[in-house]
Regions:
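Conserved pre-ATP/AMP-binding loop-to-beta segment of ANL
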Residues: 34-36, 150-156, 167-188, 195, ...
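Structural core segment of the AMP-binding/adenylate-forming
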Residues: 68, 89-92, 96-164, 178, ...
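AMP-binding/adenylate-forming catalytic core of the ANL superfamily
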Residues: 108-115, 123-129, 278, 387-389, ...
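AMP-binding/adenylate-forming catalytic domain of the ANL superfamily
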Residues: 151, 501-517
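Conserved AMP-binding/adenylation subdomain of ANL enzymes
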Residues: 207-229, 233-277, 290-291
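Conserved ATP/PPi-binding loop(s) of AMP-dependent carboxylate-activating enzymes
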Residues: 359-362, 373-405, 443
Length: 517
């Protein structure tokens, strides 16, 4: 039962001289031929189970297949697949080959895919027949792309069938000896301006992410742990915040991702497969809260840990999770370039409503000013992480200027505003580029949203700044009222008053728009 202070004090990074993600999430567990790695449930609820042994053999076969098609160390390979076994097998094979995986979201349209495959100069892409038409549409503009591997390709011209490619390969493959700083994966991140940037991570990303993962999941692993996330594995939140750290520890993951998130189905699946660990975004959890107020009366749930990130939780959601799911939700904070660095571990510390947590042991996180000096005394500044840090990205792919701009001295700037209180808790103030400057005041939309979520009539909220001739900008709130609440002038006044009282007089929304969905 170590305390937070002890965990921080005793923490030491120990990353070996040679390190490969593919070996560490798969091969090291494959000697036990019965050890379960993945339960895959497709949209028709047909289930397949994969052991670590089978994943090792299939990924070795695919690595040989890629090799036979001239894919070598350092080549970029796009993965345009959702949560399914072939996605995982592709990742592991690419890493063992010393190539670089490029994570692509199946929700992307052709333009978004084209930019990413063009920018990364990907030599190959692995996809399914559903997304193949997008690749065909852009293929002639992608001179580097000379290999298309398709799950269930059928008799399609000009492509390789995934499982044919696997079956032709030998189960024997010697993984390339990679170092922790050797490139492993590119994850594109959208900026507020211009095109997305390719965040290039080394193999050290996985060891770098483990302290945060173990922290948020209440000292993972425990006997019987089983992970599920409704997030697509093409997001860092799906792959590196859930899938890979679980497999690193030799525990199983449920792969299930229907086209449309269905809150009742989510409860059903978690009960059926005895999910212990959940990684989710607050919006999805809110949908679950609104759909099933008392889930434990309807479902036999076994949850041990829930972590959420990507947006502010709000007190109502935390309270409901505690009361109705019997689990204290652990907020997590990070970004694609430097993930899982702040959060809570309810096992060893009290969660604080509204705060995003403390620095995860192993990471040095502070609030800095524009010159890179640490800000004291709870003042507003930018959340920053001190380098070097294993979880930190190597660079933006072929964009040295953007990489340079991300740092001030030894500090990686997140672009997020926040405060750090005297107890070491961080409070999120909003994105730097979302900050609303109104009448000389700097207002973080995140804080206003969190405050509005505490209003008895509010189900969902979004806050932006809109131009104003007098104040420069004013706060505007879009509000989805709770079921049965009729939006009227009185409610609008009550909402404004609530923020004036609960947050700050100048931060209230001067414009309120009620929405129906």
């Amino acid at each position: 039962g170590a305390t937070y202070a002890e965990l921080c004090r005793n923490f030491k990074w120990e990353i070996p001289q040679y390190y490969n993600i593919g070996v560490d999430v798969c091969d090291k567990w494959a000697d036990d031929k019965t050890r379960l790695a993945l339960i895959y449930v497709d949209s028709d609820e047909i289930e397949q189970r994969y052991t670590f042994r089978v994943l090792r053999d299939r990924s070795n076969q695919l690595a040989n297949g890629l090799n036979a098609n001239a894919i070598k160390r350092g080549d970029r390979v796009g993965i345009l697949l959702s949560q399914r076994p072939e996605t995982l097998i592709s990742h592991i094979a690419i890493y063992k080959l010393g190539a670089i995986a490029v994570q692509l979201l199946t929700l992307f349209g052709p333009d978004a895919i084209e930019f990413r495959l063009q920018d990364s100069a990907a030599r190959a892409v692995v996809t399914d027949k559903e997304n193949l038409s997008k690749i065909f549409e852009i293929q002639k503009r992608l001179p580097h792309l000379n290999l298309i591997i398709v799950v269930e390709a059928g008799q399609q011209e000009g492509v390789l069938d995934f499982w044919n490619c696997v079956e032709k390969g030998s189960c024997a493959f010697t993984p390339v000896k990679t170092k922790p700083d050797d490139a492993a994966v590119i994850i594109y991140t959208s900026g507020t301006t211009g095109q997305p940037k390719g965040t290039l991570h080394g193999h050290r990303l996985l060891p770098g992410i483990l302290p945060g993962f173990e922290f948020y999941h209440n000292l993972f692993p425990r006997e019987g742990d089983l992970m599920w996330t409704p997030l697509d594995w093409a997001y860092i939140g799906g792959s590196y915040d859930a899938l890979f750290p679980t497999l690193y520890h030799g525990y199983p993951v449920l792969a299930y991702r229907p086209r449309k998130f269905d809150p009742e189905k989510a409860f059903y699946m978690m009960a059926k497969y005895r999910v212990k660990n959940l990684m989710i975004v607050p919006t999805a959890l809110r949908m679950m809260m609104h759909a099933v107020r008392r889930p434990r009366e309807r479902y036999d749930l076994h949850l041990r840990s829930i972590t959420a990130g990507g947006e502010t939780l709000g007190e109502a959601l935390s309270d409901w999770t505690r009361e109705q799911l019997g689990v204290e939700i652990n907020e997590q904070y990070g970004q694609t370039e430097c993930d899982l660095v702040v959060g809570f571990c309810s096992e060893i510390m009290n969660t604080v409503p509204g705060a995003i947590g403390k620095a995860v042991p192993g990471h040095i996180v502070e609030i800095i000013d524009k010159d890179g000096r640490v800000v004291k005394g709870g003042d507003l500044g930018e959340i920053a992480i001190k380098s070097p840090d294993p979880v930190m990205f190597l660079e933006y792919w072929q964009n040295p200027q953007a990489t340079k701009d991300k740092f001030t001295g030894e500090w990686l700037r997140t672009g997020d505003y926040g405060r750090k209180d005297e107890n070491g808790h961080f409070w999120f103030g909003g994105r730097q580029d979302d900050i609303i400057e109104s009448g000389g005041f700097r207002i973080g939309p995140g804080e206003v949203e969190a405050c509005l979520m505490k209003h008895r009539a509010v189900a969902l909220v979004g806050v932006i700044g809109v131009p104003d001739p007098v104040r420069g900008e004013i706060v505007k709130a879009f509000i989805l009222p709770k079921a049965g609440v009729t939006p009227d002038k009185a409610l609008e006044e009550s909402i404004k008053e609530h923020v004036k009282k609960r947050l700050e007089a100048h931060a209230y929304p001067r414009e309120v728009t009620f929405v129906s969905e």
